[in-house]
Amino acid sequence: MKSLIYIFLLCVSTITAQTKYEQGMRKAFELWGSEKTEEASNLFERISTAEKDKWLPHYYVAQIAIIKNWKDFDNREEVTLKANLDKAQEYLNNASSITTGNAYVTYLQAQLYTVWVAHDGMKYGMKYAGKIGQMYQEIIDKHPDNPLFIAAKASWDMGSARYFGKPVTPYCEELQRAIKLFATFKPETEFHPKGSVTPYLETVKQCNE
């Protein structure tokens, strides 16, 4: 009888913990969707501290820190950019320690490196450009129909082509394929990254120029 009571209490505790996690994540996304970015990031941080085995809160803290740098990018200050990316790297490292070989963590690491390259191509291009392309190819090989990964690689390839004065058309087919896949893509769970087709609808216009 005591064993049954213990099992019951354990199950109740697990369900309660999952509910708190889910409620917290939903609230964080709600804040983010309302453009309360700092509040969302702070909540993701608190969740990551409470939920030691969950990689997604760490992922979103890192993602928010990365995205911050694209706002008013032309007027960026390296001190601020570095602080944001250092924080992002810390949380990506945390996520990696929880989930080894996770394609989404690899994707976000490539996004982080992209900010460095965009900030100073002469300084960081040689260091990160090759890694970025390799990372994207690696995750696409594992997940060939994930539109987030396909679009990111195609967009990166197009940017690289423009930088070197080459045509972007060889990458348009993959970008267009990703845009179509976004319409039917279903993330693994409610909280998994799903991306947005919106920025790529702008990028694909370059294919008609």
Residue ranges of model-derived segments:
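"A position-specific structural signal for the A-helix of alpha-solenoid helical repeats
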Residues: 26, 60, 67, 108, ...
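Short coil/linker segments at helix-helix boundaries
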Residues: 38-41, 64-94, 111-135, 155-199
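Bacterial Sec-dependent N-terminal signal peptides
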Residues: 1-24
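Start-of-domain marker
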Residues: 18-66
